[in-house]
Amino acid sequence: MAGSSLACCLLGLLALTSACYIQNCPLGGKRAVLDLDVRTCLPCGPGGKGRCFGPSICCGDELGCFVGTAEALRCQEENYLPSPCQSGQKPCGSGGRCAAAGICCSPDGCHEDPACDPEAAFSQH
């Protein structure tokens, strides 16, 4: 009885740990992703003038941001690519990057951020 309880506990702990399963393990193991060069995310939006910032977020300087629209559908393809990507130039907010004038986006969503407004950077207070 004690042996089966111990086996159940070990299986439970194994299930709760962060494992690298065969279908989602990057080449070289879990830590290999940290060594890869980060590529620019896929183009999206009208004329491919935007970049993906999340699975349903497409932003561009000339376009603004499309969230959950047909223009952002291509961004779902990022989920199937093996290497990480990054869009935007300047970091902002909590783990986000400047996506368009005055807008900061992370994979979870977008919000207004004065740090991303190029005109605010040059204005005098």
UniProtKB/Swiss-Prot annotation:
<dbReference type="InterPro" id="IPR036387">
    <property type="entry name" value="Neurhyp_horm_dom_sf"/>
</dbReference>
<feature type="signal peptide">
    <location>
        <begin position="1"/>
        <end position="19"/>
    </location>
</feature>
<dbReference type="GO" id="GO:0005185">
    <property type="term" value="F:neurohypophyseal hormone activity"/>
</dbReference>
<dbReference type="GO" id="GO:0031894">
    <property type="term" value="F:V1A vasopressin receptor binding"/>
</dbReference>
<dbReference type="GO" id="GO:0043627">
    <property type="term" value="P:response to estrogen"/>
</dbReference>
<keyword id="KW-0372">Hormone</keyword>
<dbReference type="InterPro" id="IPR000981">
    <property type="entry name" value="Neurhyp_horm"/>
</dbReference>
<keyword id="KW-0027">Amidation</keyword>
<feature type="disulfide bond">
    <location>
        <begin position="44"/>
        <end position="58"/>
    </location>
</feature>
<comment type="function">
    <text>Oxytocin causes contraction of the smooth muscle of the uterus and of the mammary gland. Acts by binding to oxytocin receptor (OXTR).</text>
</comment>
<comment type="subunit">
    <text>Interacts with oxytocin receptor (Ki=1.5 nM). Interacts with vasopressin V1aR/AVPR1A (Ki=37 nM), V1bR/AVPR1B (Ki=222 nM), and V2R/AVPR2 receptors (Ki=823 nM).</text>
</comment>
<dbReference type="GO" id="GO:0005615">
    <property type="term" value="C:extracellular space"/>
</dbReference>
<dbReference type="GO" id="GO:0005184">
    <property type="term" value="F:neuropeptide hormone activity"/>
</dbReference>
<feature type="disulfide bond">
    <location>
        <begin position="41"/>
        <end position="85"/>
    </location>
</feature>
<comment type="similarity">
    <text>Belongs to the vasopressin/oxytocin family.</text>
</comment>
<feature type="disulfide bond">
    <location>
        <begin position="92"/>
        <end position="104"/>
    </location>
</feature>
<feature type="disulfide bond">
    <location>
        <begin position="20"/>
        <end position="25"/>
    </location>
</feature>
<keyword id="KW-0732">Signal</keyword>
<dbReference type="Pfam" id="PF00184">
    <property type="entry name" value="Hormone_5"/>
</dbReference>
<protein>
    <recommendedName>
        <fullName>Oxytocin-neurophysin 1</fullName>
    </recommendedName>
</protein>
<comment type="function">
    <text>Neurophysin 1 specifically binds oxytocin.</text>
</comment>
<dbReference type="InterPro" id="IPR022423">
    <property type="entry name" value="Neurohypophysial_hormone_CS"/>
</dbReference>
<dbReference type="GO" id="GO:0031855">
    <property type="term" value="F:oxytocin receptor binding"/>
</dbReference>
<feature type="disulfide bond">
    <location>
        <begin position="52"/>
        <end position="75"/>
    </location>
</feature>
<dbReference type="Pfam" id="PF00220">
    <property type="entry name" value="Hormone_4"/>
</dbReference>
<keyword id="KW-1015">Disulfide bond</keyword>
<feature type="disulfide bond">
    <location>
        <begin position="59"/>
        <end position="65"/>
    </location>
</feature>
<keyword id="KW-0165">Cleavage on pair of basic residues</keyword>
<feature type="disulfide bond">
    <location>
        <begin position="98"/>
        <end position="116"/>
    </location>
</feature>
<keyword id="KW-0964">Secreted</keyword>
<dbReference type="GO" id="GO:0030141">
    <property type="term" value="C:secretory granule"/>
</dbReference>
<feature type="modified residue" description="Glycine amide">
    <location>
        <position position="28"/>
    </location>
</feature>
<feature type="disulfide bond">
    <location>
        <begin position="105"/>
        <end position="110"/>
    </location>
</feature>
